[in-house]
């Protein structure tokens, strides 16, 4: 065993597991294309103030969970990204993309970092996939990102998910509610935990997001934001619900749902999985019209988005048995050299097959035919192509189907044609 171990809160992903990641990623890519979203990639680190301005200084993420550092004593603080939305919006504003096209639909699959206590489904380095729809203020926009997210989960075959939605209104609604909430919480001030006391003045809505069991009785008794909403905000929320109903997307309304980021407005949503225990959120998102202005834009930019935790998706799928038939794909052909002296010819044949788009493996260690065949079976190769002295002279090679045991001798050109036909039949089945 190596004296060096993986850093706590990070993990290695080996080939037998990476096939599961690719499966989920392929579904995300395919559906993103169907919905008209293009991929964006941003740096893994940003200036720290980007997240302080966007996520909010009273959030747990900014207050406790960011990996920040100074690249040099006179430099600005830099942070490994704890979430994607702020970086995506920064990139769009910096590139001035909204001046060239008023609507942008972007998606990502990215690595993120938070200083959390490692546990199942919650690591210090973790992955998310998500989407951002920028430039559309219609309730149809947030309904689309919810639909996109739920269709990913449906396509993956995940069962038993619960979608909760709420409306946070606009800035005036929340300002009005903050005063009502402070008035309610004031008599309980001495019972608030330290984090909630810090939030009491700055942003009491964050108190509603507390997971402290000792705080739940106080939170349950709090007035809801719903009672402070304007007619326009309620009407906006009703339209979102209409779009979800028309698509038969089931949901529950949860007036306590505020999400963990300060930039949300109007509709917010969260999806939970019964397979994940206490940390049951598998995805979520909402609308964030004011984020662009917080980051220096001259005005608001209507925007909606979602993010889902890749590790939590994989845990849920594993527990529901959705990977039972999923295995790493082996090579289509294993080229077997009957003696080490024929390795050069075997490599030439393998090169020819690969040039034709046929996945091919060849033994480089000069092992016996028996060892090579064991290797071919271990790799789940579909065919073995044998290279012997007679084959080199005649140009006719023995090709064995390792599933049916059928064997034929053909020229390399005919073998390539047969293998390509086999590939087409495989894809059509």
From Swiss-Prot:
Pfam families in the cross-refs: HGTP_anticodon, tRNA-synt_His
Keyword check for Aminoacyl-tRNA synthetase, yes or no. Answer: yes
- What GO cellular component is one of the record's annotations? cytoplasm
Q: What is its EC number?
A: 6.1.1.21
As for subcellular location, the record says: Cytoplasm
Q: Reaction catalysed?
A: tRNA(His) + L-histidine + ATP = L-histidyl-tRNA(His) + AMP + diphosphate + H(+)
A GO BP term here is: histidyl-tRNA aminoacylation
**Which key words are in the record?**
Aminoacyl-tRNA synthetase, ATP-binding, Cytoplasm, Ligase, Nucleotide-binding, Protein biosynthesis
Looking at the record's lineage, which domain of life comes first? Answer: Bacteria
Query: Family, per the entry?
Result: Belongs to the class-II aminoacyl-tRNA synthetase family.
Assembly? Homodimer.
Question: What PANTHER family has UniProt attached to this entry?
Answer: HISTIDINE--TRNA LIGASE, MITOCHONDRIAL-RELATED, HISTIDYL-TRNA SYNTHETASE
Name of this protein: Histidine--tRNA ligase
Please tell me the species this chain comes from: Chlorobium phaeobacteroides (strain DSM 266 / SMG 266 / 2430)
State which gene encodes it. hisS
